Amino acid sequence: MEQFECITVEEAYQKLRQGAAVLVDIRDPQSYAMGHAPQAFHLTNDTLGAFMRKHGFDTAVMVMCYHGNSSKGAAQYLLQQGYDAVYSIDGGFEAWHRRFPANVANGA
C-alpha cells in the first residue's frame, strides 16, 4: 500500500471484529479517557515506540482522531515508518460514537 486508504466506521468495525487490523486513537489523553473505541491503542509521541515494538510493519493499522482529519496525517506518517497497510477512519471518533454508542470504553 503506497498510500493510506480512507474507510468508514462500519468498515473499521468489521476489520476490528475480524482481527484484520489494529485500531489506534490519536486524540488527546482527556478525550481518549472520556471515551474511545474498545481495543483502541492510545497512540501519542510517547507511546509510538511501544506500539511499533508490539505491532510489526505487516500489521494493518486503522487511525482514529476526532473527526477524520488529523488521522490522515498520522496515517501517512505510519506508512512512512514502514507499515504496509494503513487506514484513516472517516468521521473519526465522533462518527464512531454516533454509529456505535454501545461500543465506547472509558478510562485510560
From Swiss-Prot:
GO biological process, one term: glycerol metabolic process
Domain Rhodanese: 17-105
Keyword hit for Nucleotide-binding: no
Entry-linked Pfam families: Rhodanese
Cellular component terms (Gene Ontology): cytoplasm
UniProt-listed Enzyme Commission number(s): 2.8.1.1
Catalytic activity: thiosulfate + hydrogen cyanide = thiocyanate + sulfite + 2 H(+); thiosulfate + [thioredoxin]-dithiol = [thioredoxin]-disulfide + hydrogen sulfide + sulfite + 2 H(+)
Disulfide bonding pattern of the chain: none
UniProt subcellular location: Cytoplasm
Coiled-coil zones: none
Residues at the catalytic site: 65
Keyword annotations from UniProtKB, A to Z: Cytoplasm, Transferase
Annotated signal peptide: none
GO terms of molecular function: thiosulfate-cyanide sulfurtransferase activity
NCBIfam families: PRK00162.1
Job description of the protein: Transferase that catalyzes the transfer of sulfur from thiosulfate to thiophilic acceptors such as cyanide or dithiols. May function in a CysM-independent thiosulfate assimilation pathway by catalyzing the conversion of thiosulfate to sulfite, which can then be used for L-cysteine biosynthesis.
Family: Belongs to the GlpE family.
Name the UniProt record assigns to this protein: Thiosulfate sulfurtransferase GlpE
Organism classification: Bacteria, Pseudomonadati, Pseudomonadota, Gammaproteobacteria, Enterobacterales
